[in-house]
Each structure stands twice: as C-alpha cells, then as structure tokens.
Amino acid sequence: MDFVMKQALGGATKDMGKMLGGDEEKDPDAEKKEEERLEALRQAEEERAGKYAKMEAEREVMRQGIRDKYGIKKKEEKEAEAMAAMEAQAEGSLTRPKKAIPAGCGDEDEEEESILDTVLKYLPGPLQDMFKK
C-alpha cells in the first residue's frame, strides 16, 4: 500500500507527513516572530481605539454645538429635570396630582355591546329574538 501511495503522489510524500501533523521543522525564530506579531496587533488595536475615541469626541463636540444652537437638551438632561420636577411636586404633599387616565380606559362596555351585536347579526332569527330578550 505504501508503494502505491508513493508512486501515485511522487515526491510529495515528504510534505504529506508535515501536512498530516507529522514531524515539523521548528523555526528557531518562530517564537520571536510570534511575539513581534502579537505586539504589532496590540499596537494596531490601541491606535484604532485612539482614533475611534478622538472621532467620537469630535462628534460629541459637533452634537453639542447643534444642541446649543437650536436649544435642544440631551435626553438624560430632560429625564433628570422631569424627575426633579416630579419629586419637588410630590414632596410632603398629600394632594399631589393623580396620574391621568389614558383615553379609552372606560370605553370597554361600548366595545362589548358592539361585539355582541355583531355576533347576533350572524345568528338565525329565532336565536336573535332569544338573546334580545
């Protein structure tokens, strides 16, 4: 079997052992090269992070300029002011304003009647008379 494989592959059998995980020649400088590669990757990542931080700072300066120009507040500032206003109103007050009832909360009865009427339309005449009484 080995003979057939050697004949079929020719001179590539020497490299075949290396491909299959056999004896690999160790490069004496491989460890040093790997350290240099990792150091270069780390430096590239630091540079990228620095550029990104600088870019974000420039964007924030531009955003703040637009906010100042048009009198727009940041979302966090709006929320903080709203919370402070709510606390100021509610502190020590027994008569604080109640939460507003959303529209449509008391309209459930009308909806139920309309659903019942809709169902009654599809029933035969004698059954409609029974349910109407």
Swiss-Prot record:
Q: Could you name the Gene Ontology cellular component terms for this entry?
A: cytosol; SNARE complex; terminal bouton
Q: Report the subcellular localization.
A: Cytoplasm, Cytosol
Similarity annotation: Belongs to the complexin/synaphin family.
Q: Which Gene3D superfamilies does its entry note?
A: Single Helix bin
Tell me if rRNA-binding is a UniProt keyword of this record: no
- Key words, A-Z: Coiled coil, Cytoplasm, Exocytosis, Neurotransmitter transport, Transport
Regions of compositional bias (Basic and acidic residues) in chain numbering: 15-40
CDD domains reported in the protein's UniProt record: Complexin_NTD_CPLX_I_II
Question: Per UniProt, what is one Pfam family of this protein?
Answer: Synaphin
- The domain of life is Eukaryota
Species source reads Narke japonica
Recorded protein name is Complexin-1
| UniProt feature coiled coil, ranges | 28-60
Q: In which tissues is it expressed?
A: Nervous system. Present in electric organ (at protein level).
Q: What does this protein do?
A: Positively regulates a late step in synaptic vesicle exocytosis.
UniProt GO molecular function: syntaxin binding
Q: How does it assemble?
A: Binds to the SNARE core complex containing SNAP25, VAMP2 and syntaxin-1.
Biological-process GO terms, alphabetical: regulation of neurotransmitter secretion; synaptic vesicle exocytosis
Q: Does the keyword field hold Cytoplasm? A: yes
* Region (Disordered) residue spans: 1-40, 85-112
Predominant cellular place of this UniProt entry's protein: cytoplasm
